[in-house]
C-alpha cells in the first residue's frame, strides 16, 4: 500500500514539473515547442496503456479528420505505437500471431512488390500541383503506411469482441471530428475561403461529409421499420438525405443507396430491398408529373437528372451531362496511345509527376494559353476515375492485382459481415466490412483515385483480423470441412428415447 502511494506521489510530482516546463517551452506558440512539451505526456500515456496500446492504431486516425494531413494519419499512428507494441511483446504482456488468409496475403504482397518496382523505375520527385497543393510522392507514402498497417494488423492477437469495441469507439470519434470539420467553416467563414461549401451558388456541399456519415451509421444500426417507430431517428435520416441531395453529388447518393441495398441483403430484408426502390420511383414519377421537381434546389435536380424519365430543369440536366462528357473526353486522352499523358500503361508512370511538364503547364495557365482546365487536370493525374488514375500510377499490372484483391476482399467482407451482424459490436464491424464491400464498386464505376487502394488495404487488414478471430472462436466453419456422415436410420434411432420393457428392465 505504501509502495503504491509512493509511486503515485512520485508520478504526480514529475507530471507537475513537466507541465510547468512544457508551459514555459510552448508559451511562444511554436508548433515544434508545443509538440516537445506534449511529447513526455504522450509517451507516458503510451507506456501506461500496456497491452492495450494497439487500440491507438484504430483511434488515432479519426483525430486527424479536421486537418489537411489526415491522409497520413495511419502512418503516424502505426509508426509511433509500434515500438510500444513490440516492447509489450518483449515483456510478455502480449503475444504475436499471424492472421493468415494465404490467397489475400499473396496478392497484396505482389502488389507491394510491384509498387516497389515502380518506385525504383520512377523514384520520388517533388512535383507542383497548381490546382491545390504541393505533391510528388504521396502515393508511395500512402502505400508505405498501408504496408506497415497491414503487417501490424496481421500480427495482432485479439478477440472479435475487443476489436469490435474499439471499432465502435472509432465511429464515435469519426462522428465527433467530422462534425468539428463541418462546423469550423460555418462558425469561422474567413478560415474556409470564399468558395467553401458552394459551387457557383448552385450547389451547397457544406453538410455533405457529416450527412453521408450520419446516414451510413443509421442504415447500419436501424432498419426502416425501426426508424419509423422512432421518429427522431427518422427525422435525422431525412435531414441527412437532404444534406446529400442539396450537394448535387450523384456519387454520394449512389453510395448510400448501394449501402442500403447491401445491408438489406445482409439481414435478409427482402421486402424492404424490393419494395423501397419501387415506392421511391413511384413517388418521384408522381412528383415529376405534377412539376414539383422543378421547384427543388438545383443540387437535387442535378442528382435526379440521372433518371431520364423525370422532368427536371434543362440547366440541371445540361450541367450533369456536361460533367459526364468532360470526364469521358479526358479518359479518351488517357487511353489514346497518340497522347503522352500516360507514358507506360503496362507498368505505370509512378506517383511523382515530371517537373518539366508541370512547369510548362503552369506557363500555359498563367498566360491563358489553354481555354479549359481539362489539360491541367490531365497533366496532374486528376482523372476523376479510379481505373484511369491507377493505370497512370501502377499500370495495367497494378490495376489487375487490385481487381483480384478487391474480389477476394469483398468475399471475406461479406462473410465477416454475416458472422458478426447480430453481435454486440455489430455497428463497428459492419462499418468496416460493408463500406469496404461497396468501395471497389464505387472505385470502378463511380469515382476513385489510385491512393484509395492503400486505404482499402488497411481496411482489409482489419477484416482479416476479424475473420481469423471468427475461426479461432468457432464462429466460422469452412465449407470444405464436412462432418462425419451418419446414416439417417441411425440418427433417428439415437434421437428416439428408450421405451421401458414389460419386465421393467430398460431396453
Feature roles, as predicted:
Residues 1-7, 230, 415-430, 434, ...:
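A juxtamembrane structural motif centered on a specific transmembrane helix
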Residues 21-33, 68-78, 200-205, 231-272, ...:
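Helix-loop-helix junctions and helix-breaking kinks within/between transmembrane helices
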Residues 39-44, 145-190, 200-267, 504:
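Alpha-helical transmembrane segments of multi-pass inner-membrane proteins
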Residues 44-144, 226, 431-438:
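N-terminal hydrophobic segments of proteins, predominantly signal-anchor/transmembrane helices
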Residues 49-52, 90-106, 219-235, 267-275, ...:
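Membrane-interface helix-loop-helix junctions at transmembrane boundaries of multi-pass membrane enzymes
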Residues 105, 377-383, 393-437, 499, ...:
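Hydrophobic transmembrane alpha-helices and their immediate junctions
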Residues 191, 321-325, 329-394, 413, ...:
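Long extracytoplasmic/lumenal interhelical loops at the membrane interface
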Residues 242, 246-247, 264-318, 339-340:
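A membrane-periplasm/extracellular boundary helix in multi-pass inner-membrane enzymes
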Amino acid at each position: 500500500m505504501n509502495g503504491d502511494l509512493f509511486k503515485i506521489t512520485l508520478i504526480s510530482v514529475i507530471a507537475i514539473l513537466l507541465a510547468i516546463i512544457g508551459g514555459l517551452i510552448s508559451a511562444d506558440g511554436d508548433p515544434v515547442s508545443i509538440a516537445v512539451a506534449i511529447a513526455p505526456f504522450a509517451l507516458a500515456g503510451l507506456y501506461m496503456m500496456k497491452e492495450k496500446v494497439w487500440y491507438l492504431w484504430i483511434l488515432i486516425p479519426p483525430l486527424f479528420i479536421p486537418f489537411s494531413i489526415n491522409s497520413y494519419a495511419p502512418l503516424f499512428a502505426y509508426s509511433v505505437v509500434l515500438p510500444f507494441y513490440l516492447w509489450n511483446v518483449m515483456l510478455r504482456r502480449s503475444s504475436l500471431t499471424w492472421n493468415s488468409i494465404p490467397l489475400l496475403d499473396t496478392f497484396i504482397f505482389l502488389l507491394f512488390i510491384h509498387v516497389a518496382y515502380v518506385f525504383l523505375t520512377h523514384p520520388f520527385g517533388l512535383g507542383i500541383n497548381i490546382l491545390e497543393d504541393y505533391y510528388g510522392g504521396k502515393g508511395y507514402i500512402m502505400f508505405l503506411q498501408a504496408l506497415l498497417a497491414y503487417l501490424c494488423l496481421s500480427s495482432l492477437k485479439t478477440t472479435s469482441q475487443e476489436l469490435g469495441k474499439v471499432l465502435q469507439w472509432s465511429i464515435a470519434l469519426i462522428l465527433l471530428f467530422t462534425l468539428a470539420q463541418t462546423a469550423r467553416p460555418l462558425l469561422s467563414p474567413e478560415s474556409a475561403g470564399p468558395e467553401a461549401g458552394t459551387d457557383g451558388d448552385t450547389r451547397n456541399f457544406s453538410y455533405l461529409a457529416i450527412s453521408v456519415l450520419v446516414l451510413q451509421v443509421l442504415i447500419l444500426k436501424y432498419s426502416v421499420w425501426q426508424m419509423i417507430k422512432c421518429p427522431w431517428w427518422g427525422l435525422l435520416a431525412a435531414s441527412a438525405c437532404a444534406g446529400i441531395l442539396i450537394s448535387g453529388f450523384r456519387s454520394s447518393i449512389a453510395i448510400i443507396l448501394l449501402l442500403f441495398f447491401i445491408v438489406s441483403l445482409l439481414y435478409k430484408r427482402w421486402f424492404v430491398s424490393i419494395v423501397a426502390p419501387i415506392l421511391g420511383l413511384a413517388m418521384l414519377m408522381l412528383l415529376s408529373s405534377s412539376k414539383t421537381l422543378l421547384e427543388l434546389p438545383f443540387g437535387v435536380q442535378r442528382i435526379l437528372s440521372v433518371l431520364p424519365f423525370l422532368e427536371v430543369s434543362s440547366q440541371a440536366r445540361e450541367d450533369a451531362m456536361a460533367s459526364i462528357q468532360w470526364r469521358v473526353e479526358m479518359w479518351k486522352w488517357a487511353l489514346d496511345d497518340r497522347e503522352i499523358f500516360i507514358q507506360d500503361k503496362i507498368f505505370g508512370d509512378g506517383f511523382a509527376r515530371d517537373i518539366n511538364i508541370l512547369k510548362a503547364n503552369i506557363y500555359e495557365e498563367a498566360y491563358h494559353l489553354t481555354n479549359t482546365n481539362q489539360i491541367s487536370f490531365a497533366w496532374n493525374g486528376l482523372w476523376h476515375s479510379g481505373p484511369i488514375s491507377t493505370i497512370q500510377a501502377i499500370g495495367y499490372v497494378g490495376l489487375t492485382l487490385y481487381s483480384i484483391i478487391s474480389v477476394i476482399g469483398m468475399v471475406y467482407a461479406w462473410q465477416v459481415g454475416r458472422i458478426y451482424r447480430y453481435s454486440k459490436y455489430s455497428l463497428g464491424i459492419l462499418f468496416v466490412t460493408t463500406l469496404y464491400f461497396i468501395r471497389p464498386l464505387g472505385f470502378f464505376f463511380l469515382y476513385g483515385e489510385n491512393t484509395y487502394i492503400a486505404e482499402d488495404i488497411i481496411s482489409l487488414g482489419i477484416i482479416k483480423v476479424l475473420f481469423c478471430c471468427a475461426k479461432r472462436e468457432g464462429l466460422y466453419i469452412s465449407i470444405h470441412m464436412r462432418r462425419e456422415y451418419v446414416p439417417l436410420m441411425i440418427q433417428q434411432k439415437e434421437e428416439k428415447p428408450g421405451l421401458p420393457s414389460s419386465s421393467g428392465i430398460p431396453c
